[in-house]
Amino acid sequence: MGRNANTNTTKNYGKEKDDFIEFDYSSGANAAHGRIYLDNETSKDTYSIVPISLSLNGLAIKGCRVYIPRGNDEKGPGIMFPAFKNNSGEYIPYMYMYEKDDIAFLKELAQHIADKCK
């Protein structure tokens, strides 16, 4: 069985304290993969998100996290980006560097991860 580059997979692993979900998500030229660790020591509705490996149009970005809201949050889940310091000393989120297609992919990715964490 051949592997389709656009196949999105999620695997669940259970090890009591170190439960995590491993994901591999792609759409077109964009791809993301990594692990989401489930925090068993607080609330079952609380998720501890490790930085995910993210690649957009071949550009690798480290330090991203996924925001998964609890309760009714109109914004829904989202990707939290690290910031970089520009020449003026201001911190600017990487989010402002991306095209509309990339933003759409990031929204899909965040929703995919949120759905898998339910």
Report residues per predicted region.
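Single-stranded nucleic acid-binding surfaces, predominantly the OB-fold ssDNA-binding core
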Residues: G2-K118
